[in-house]
């Protein structure tokens, strides 16, 4: 396991402390979330099950014997645990590098507490070095791309990739994201946009940050 993975794994272990006994919890998508799923395997008898933010996560949860629930069949979730691509000190994030941003945002919004787990490289002063994913309806791809150019970004179509919802992803490079909440709302209002990967309206409540010295820093 490389150093970055060790930091992710340490944060994932700490996140178990936030899982209520007997609960149905929300589980995210991606390499860091996978470390959390590995940790869940140790306590699977203590929880009722999980709501997954992607088909990949659902498959992984089922493989370790955790029951996966449809979000429509459960109420508010006590906690959602997921990673991020970038996070700032206000706990605003860029997410969706794995393409599951819409379902991640839905499950996060359905949860009382959002625990973000990350290695220290993900904490940044300003969001935007990581390209911002935007999920778009296929027929609106070019329209949305032109609007994103007017915002100062350089959108790139993620070719040969389709989301779990049957849509496309534009990865937007070089956006100046000084006001994440305003940028999120501006992009989400564009016709044809399902959602963008800015999580400012539904930011994290707690950041568990794996450090290179083996510790996990808690930021709230």
From Swiss-Prot:
Q: Report which reactions are catalysed by this protein.
A: aldehydo-D-ribose 5-phosphate = D-ribulose 5-phosphate
Q: Kindly identify the residues recorded as the active site.
A: 104 (proton acceptor)
Task: Give the enzyme class.
Answer: isomerase
Looking at the Swiss-Prot or TrEMBL record, what is one Pfam family this protein matches?
Rib_5-P_isom_A
Q: In which pathway does it act?
A: Carbohydrate degradation; pentose phosphate pathway; D-ribose 5-phosphate from D-ribulose 5-phosphate (non-oxidative stage): step 1/1
Quick check: keyword Isomerase in the entry? yes
* Membrane-traversing stretches: none
Report the domain of life of the source organism.
Answer: Bacteria
Q: Which SUPFAM superfamilies match?
A: D-ribose-5-phosphate isomerase (RpiA), lid domain, NagB/RpiA/CoA transferase-like
Gene3D superfamilies linked: 3.30.70.260, 3.40.50.1360
Which key words tag this protein in UniProt? Answer: Isomerase
- Give GO MF terms, alphabetically: ribose-5-phosphate isomerase activity
Q: Which GO terms describe its cellular component?
A: cytosol
Q: Share an example GO biological-process annotation for this protein.
A: pentose-phosphate shunt, non-oxidative branch
Q: Which residues bind substrate?
A: 29-32, 82-85, 95-98, 122
- Signal peptide residues on this chain, from the entry's feature table: none
Q: What is its EC number?
A: 5.3.1.6
Q: Which family does it belong to?
A: Belongs to the ribose 5-phosphate isomerase family.
Write out the function statement from the record: Catalyzes the reversible conversion of ribose-5-phosphate to ribulose 5-phosphate.
Subunit structure, interactors included: Homodimer.
What name does UniProt use for this protein? Ribose-5-phosphate isomerase A
What is the native source organism of this protein? Laribacter hongkongensis (strain HLHK9)
């Amino acid at each position: 396991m490389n150093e970055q993975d060790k930091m992710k794994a340490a944060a994932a272990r700490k996140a178990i402390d936030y899982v209520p006994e007997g609960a149905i919890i929300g589980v995210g998508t991606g390499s860091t979330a996978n470390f959390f799923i590995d940790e869940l395997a140790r306590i699977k008898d203590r929880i009722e099950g999980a709501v997954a933010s992607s088909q990949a996560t659902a498959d992984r949860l089922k493989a370790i014997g955790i029951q996966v629930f449809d979000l429509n069949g459960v109420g508010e979730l006590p906690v959602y645990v997921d990673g991020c691509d970038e996070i700032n000190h206000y706990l605003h994030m860029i997410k969706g590098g794995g393409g599951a941003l819409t379902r991640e945002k839905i499950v996060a919004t359905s949860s009382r507490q959002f625990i973000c787990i990350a290695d220290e490289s993900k904490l940044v002063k300003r969001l935007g070095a990581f390209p911002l994913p935007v999920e778009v309806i296929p027929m609106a791809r070019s329209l949305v791309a032109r609007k994103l150019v007017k915002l100062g970004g350089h959108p790139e179509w993620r070719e040969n990739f389709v989301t779990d919802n049957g849509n496309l992803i534009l990865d937007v490079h070089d956006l100046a994201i000084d006001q994440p909440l305003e940028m999120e709302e501006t992009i989400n209002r564009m016709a044809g946009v399902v959602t963008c990967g800015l999580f400012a309206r539904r930011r994290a409540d707690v950041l568990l940050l794996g450090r290179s010295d083996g510790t996990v820093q808690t930021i709230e």
